[in-house]
């Protein structure tokens, strides 16, 4: 839908000496970590590599299921896609994962309310193609840590519109 279109894939200059790290933290409020990470520095479908992080929501097993299942759908869709345009490939895979998660949540009462954020990247030549939905973030570290994605959240939208400051959003 409309929110997904706002997750337009970005093209960023990439370095060839790339190292990939992932870290998740359950935080102090949650009892279960609903994060799911996928990283492949070898080809996935027509993409030369693929990196994805999803953070589920929806309580108990539903959020955990949403994040892991969404990434599995994403990877399967990318493997089967015959297009070579990374923007189209990633967008189609995210849209498919989104549709399937919504449909499953509607069919199964135990999964009602589930959802997931997602950030996806692929490095093609000198460029990184990045897409995100929700508030899962992608950072690049090169002497300093730099956030590449912009959160899709009510608070971030309030900051963008000038209704609150970034400092107020952090507190």
Where do the model's predicted regions map?
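PP2C/PPM-type serine/threonine phosphatase catalytic domain
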Residues: 1-171
């Amino acid at each position: 839908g409309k929110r997904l279109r706002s997750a337009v894939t970005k093209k960023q200059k990439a370095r060839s000496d790339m190292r990939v790290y992932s870290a998740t933290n359950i935080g102090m409020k949650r009892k279960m970590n609903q994060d799911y990470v996928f990283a492949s520095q070898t080809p996935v479908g027509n993409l030369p590599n693929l990196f994805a992080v999803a953070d589920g929501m929806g309580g108990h097993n539903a959020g955990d299921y949403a994040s892991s299942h969404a990434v599995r759908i994403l990877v399967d869709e990318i493997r089967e896609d015959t297009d070579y345009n990374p923007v189209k490939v990633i967008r189609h895979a995210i849209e498919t994962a989104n549709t399937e998660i919504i449909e499953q949540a509607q069919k199964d009462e135990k999964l009602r309310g589930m959802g997931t954020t997602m950030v996806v990247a692929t490095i093609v030549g000198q460029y990184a193609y990045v897409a995100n939905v929700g508030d899962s973030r992608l950072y690049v570290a090169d002497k300093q840590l730099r956030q590449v994605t912009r959160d899709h959240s009510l608070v971030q939208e309030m900051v963008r519109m000038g209704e609150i400051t970034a400092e107020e959003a952090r507190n």
